[in-house]
Amino acid sequence: MQAITSPFSESWGEYRLRKEDFSWHKANEGRLQGKWLRGLWSNELYQERRSSTTGRADDMMTVATLSLPPTLEIQKFVELFKLAYMHMRFVHPMLGVTIETNVFSIPLLPCFVYEQVTSFDEVQAWADRTVHVHTCESEQDRALSMSDRIQCVRNTVGTRPLPISQHTREWHIICFGREEDAHHVALMSYCAHSVSDARAELLLLQQLLDEMARLEGAWPVSASHPSHPAAHEWGSEIKRLTPSLMEMIGVPIDAFEEEAARELVRSVTSEPSLRLDEGRPIAEPELSETLHARVVFSKEETDALHQAAKAHGWSLTHLVDAARHMAYMQVRRPYLEAWHWSPIPEKLHTDFLIPMDARYAILETFRDGASGHVCNATEGFTTTIPLMDPYYIPIERELASSEKELHELSQVRTLAYMAQSLCLQYNAQKKQAKQRMMSSIPTLVLAGVFLPTYPFQSLSPEGFSSVGVVDRLLTTRIPLPGHTQPIDIIDWTVGLLMSKHRGSLQFSLHIWTFQEQLNLSVVHTPHITKERTALFLDTMRSTLKLFLMAYEQHGKPIDIPAAPPTPFKEPTLFQYVGRWLQSLLSH
């Protein structure tokens, strides 16, 4: 391995970085002269994985579906939303940043750009440019259900790249055409992942709706009204531009920990891991249509899963993540159980990435007070699970050959073993946030994220992501002054964009809780079939429900195996020959 040195050291040659490039500073020359700049680093750089060569495109697209009071016209809702959004730009100026490359010594190193506001007219033009209203233009549009209409707009918008040199966030207000949906709208946020995460989206949505209620209480709000965003001291918002997450949690920009970097590199390249599919699409990096599949547990089931997890010393996240690993194995079962003379190596998939909200670690100096940090504050870690640990015998196969209590079943015991293994890894990793931050700098450089050929592997990981969002962040009912009925948030979903390039995500799992109901959602490209996705989600759902039934029937916590309870048994020579003959006949 090449000797690891600090990316701020001169020995990096073309990779030499300047610390001052990563703090907000005013450009004194060049095409961005007079604008404020800051290089992206750490988690921001990881999320900003786009280029014309690699085709990475992991921008976020969240959707909140609202039920409006019958007395609130859609046109007025749009007007209130725009005013509230302009106010949020003053409170959180990061909403107004753009992203540029070819600015610093490394051409592909992206940087945030902010142009200080000199008049309210500029803010109004920005809002007009970034807030779009989608009305039903045809009979076909008007006949669509709310979910189908959202999916239609999502794929229309989501196959058009976000113009990040103009803005890094767009809002799309979706109207519906059926009579029963007349007083509903959907708020779709399309934004660069480097400037936001799922928790930030919820925080921002809550603040927007609260501000809309405040404006409605002061209505009519003219430009001279003190509640109007035109009354703000525009230009002073520059003081609230936020530094990188590393700085906010107290890690110096040029922090470096060589051994941690080496260990991180080893952990994501040496362990065998499953890949979802044997083949990958190889195409131009244009954005792909994405498909969405979802499982929603009832409030009672969600509460019971919480209680079952707690009884075993786990969180619900540990339990759900264990089911995720088992479902991932189930999708690959035919390959794992089949005999191959030359099996495809299973070492190219980076281990499961677990996002973590780092807002708890932000220093008091950088706290946004009650408003929360409405930017990307996600750091993460990987869990290392041996290739065959999630292997299990499905309940229908096991009960066909033996009689067992539910808590004795392979599927239940494997889930318990996996949850315990993940719990131990989670607890160990949570204490190492700053260490991971220090090691992520050289790791990102070693991974070649500054190279136009990144990712350089011929087979790149599909990648999994998860979002743990709790609904207490989002008030689902917002009273409106002057209206007898409130605005109700009746649904919320999170997704991301994908491209056809082999380096882009093809499949991503998201986990959240909304209105006390556990949601499991998969976003995938057509390359990953609907059947595979359905098998994945059905396995997660059935495994969790089976575990819950076993725990309730057993009446006490299930014994946690000390080792994988269902080791994979190699087929006998007779079985090998039989499968070989069967494969010949099938062709």
Task: Describe the predicted segments one by one.
Residues 1-239, 317-333, 481-587:
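Non-catalytic N-terminal regions of enzymes
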Residues 361-424:
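A short, structured beta-strand-centered segment in the mid-to-C-terminal lobe
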Residues 297, 320, 408, 419-421, ...:
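Hydrophobic alpha/beta scaffold of the E2-like acyltransferase core of 2-oxoacid dehydrogenase complexes
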Residues 179-180, 334-347, 391-411, 481:
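Intrinsically disordered, low-complexity domain-flanking/linker segments in eukaryotic proteins
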Residues 2-12, 103-150, 154, 175, ...:
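Short beta-strand/turn segments that mark the catalytic/cofactor-handling region
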Residues 254-314:
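Flexible, P/S/T/G-rich "lid" or insertion loops adjacent to the active sites of thioester-utilizing
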